[in-house]
Design a protein with these regions (language model features):
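N-terminal/domain-start alpha-helical segments
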Residues: 1-128
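Short, Lys/Arg-enriched segments at the junction into DNA-binding effector domains
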Residues: 9-10, 122-147
Length: 147
């Protein structure tokens, strides 16, 4: 069940398996997302730094630079705060922890249902937008939603 959206949201989809990338991209576009694609880690880092996205869906196993390194470099070197969902077949606890340690906001294990990906995207985007509406100066917190 898709949530109605008032405006399009942009997503960078980083997946080296073309068939899966096309399936996920088509689904997201049908639910009012604007999707950019990257099939490798270097392209993902370039797009993640030069463009502004509402979220990034990032596969861990990529040619060249892996997804964990991409995530860590976007967070540490480029200070990118865009929500990142790791997308991978790795389902061991250690793998998940490495994803979160690299800076991921969520972790989705393949195979997955498209509505679950959409729900997770909606959630990380909603949380990131909520955080942008809160400001703190000298211990005084201001929430623009309550004004």
């Amino acid at each position: 069940m898709s949530m109605a959206k008032n405006s399009s949201r942009s997503v960078l989809l980083v997946e080296d398996h073309q068939e899966l990338a096309e399936t996920v991209g088509s689904y997201l576009e049908a639910t009012n997302y604007i999707v950019d694609y990257a099939g490798d880690g270097l392209t993902a880092m370039h797009l993640g730094v030069t463009n502004t996205y509402d979220a990034i869906v990032l596969d861990i196993m990529l040619p060249g630079v892996d997804g964990l390194t991409v995530c860590q470099r976007l967070r540490d070197d480029a200070a990118v705060t865009t929500p990142i969902i790791m997308l991978t077949a790795r389902d061991q606890l250690d793998d998940k922890l490495k994803g979160f340690e690299s800076g991921a906001d969520d972790y989705l294990i393949k195979p997955f249902d498209m509505p679950e990906l959409e729900a997770r995207l909606d959630a990380v985007i909603r949380r990131s937008q909520h955080l942008e509406k809160q400001y703190e100066v000298s211990g005084l917190k201001l929430n623009l939603d309550t004004m």
